Each structure stands twice: as C-alpha cells, then as structure tokens.
C-alpha cells in the first residue's frame, strides 16, 4: 500500500514532528513497507486458531502486600533542603 507525501505530512503534524523533504521520503517508504506487511498478515488464515486474550497463559505474578517497616519521618527529612512542620517544602510551580 503506497502512502502519499501528504499523508506522511499529516501524520508528522499529528505527531508534532517537523520533517524536511528527505525525511518525508524516508518515512513514506518505511510506512508503505509497514502497511504492506500488515496486509500480508491480513491474508493469514486464522480460522483454526482459538481466540485468546494473550498468547501465553499467565497467572497472577503479583506478590502479597506485606506491611514492612520504613525509615522514620525525621530520617526522611534529614537531608531535605527545606522543610516546614515535618513536611518537605518544595518551590511553588503553579501561580
């Protein structure tokens, strides 16, 4: 599937990319090859393949939540450049 330069420019604009003419040509070729590959994938007969949500069976691999001790508030604030009433003080970034 051939992609046009206008389509590449549109994709670049949506991606907030500024491309020169050489780059547009490169992306035009690369995107065309990608779309050709996808077309080949669409030709594969998958009628005998059972639908799955994942290609490998996964189990819950999360660990249990366990409460563990941590450093104290004073220890955490020890190296803070600025603090107020046992809280970190950071520069204001929103007016």
Swiss-Prot record:
InterPro entries: Asp/Glu-ADT_sf_sub_c, GatC
Claim: ATP-binding is one of the keywords in the record: yes
GO biological process: glutaminyl-tRNAGln biosynthesis via transamidation; regulation of translational fidelity; translation
UniProt GO molecular function: asparaginyl-tRNA synthase (glutamine-hydrolyzing) activity; ATP binding; glutaminyl-tRNA synthase (glutamine-hydrolyzing) activity
UniProt-listed Enzyme Commission number(s): 6.3.5.-
Catalytic activity, reaction form: L-glutamyl-tRNA(Gln) + L-glutamine + ATP + H2O = L-glutaminyl-tRNA(Gln) + L-glutamate + ADP + phosphate + H(+); L-aspartyl-tRNA(Asn) + L-glutamine + ATP + H2O = L-asparaginyl-tRNA(Asn) + L-glutamate + ADP + phosphate + 2 H(+)
Keyword Metal-binding: no
Family (UniProt): Belongs to the GatC family.
PANTHER family xrefs: GLUTAMYL-TRNA(GLN) AMIDOTRANSFERASE SUBUNIT C, MITOCHONDRIAL
Chain's role: Allows the formation of correctly charged Asn-tRNA(Asn) or Gln-tRNA(Gln) through the transamidation of misacylated Asp-tRNA(Asn) or Glu-tRNA(Gln) in organisms which lack either or both of asparaginyl-tRNA or glutaminyl-tRNA synthetases. The reaction takes place in the presence of glutamine and ATP through an activated phospho-Asp-tRNA(Asn) or phospho-Glu-tRNA(Gln).
Subunit structure: Heterotrimer of A, B and C subunits.
Name under which the protein is recorded: Aspartyl/glutamyl-tRNA(Asn/Gln) amidotransferase subunit C
Species whose genome carries this gene: Thermodesulfovibrio yellowstonii (strain ATCC 51303 / DSM 11347 / YP87)
Taxonomy of the source species: Bacteria, Pseudomonadati, Nitrospirota, Thermodesulfovibrionia, Thermodesulfovibrionales
Gene this protein is translated from: gatC
